[in-house]
Amino acid sequence: MRTSSLVLFAAVAVFGAACTAAAGDESWKTIDANDRHVQDVALWAVAETDWASATGGLTLNTVDGAEKRFEAGVNYYRLTLEASSRVVAKYLRFQAVVYEEGDEHKLVSFVPIH
């Protein structure tokens, strides 16, 4: 009984890992970072983030990379961007994930990267 439980547990773990990998980064598609809509989404994300107020305001400099995922009628954008701060005299790099459904946007994450 104990051996069959371990085999079942291992099978479930492998299946779960396979499902996670299938739904992971492979579903993101690279898109044109210079596309006007991508630029608009990036501008919105920079204005929306708490980092903007914490650093005295952020200004979008460039979108260095852009990926898109379409899931259940919703667009998700994963953007690698560079912004500058009026207070911190240097360029900062961030990864932003934005949810877009119709005209509605939500900032899923906005994290600094190196």
UniProtKB/Swiss-Prot annotation:
Organism name: Oryza sativa subsp. japonica (Rice)
Q: What is the documented function of this protein?
A: Specific inhibitor of cysteine proteinases. Probably involved in the regulation of endogenous processes and in defense against pests and pathogens.
GO MF annotations, alphabetized: cysteine-type endopeptidase inhibitor activity
Localisation: Secreted
Q: What is its main location?
A: secreted
* Protein name per the record: Putative cysteine proteinase inhibitor 9
Disulfide bond sites: none
- Give the InterPro entries listed for this entry: Cystatin, Cystatin_dom, Cystatin_sf
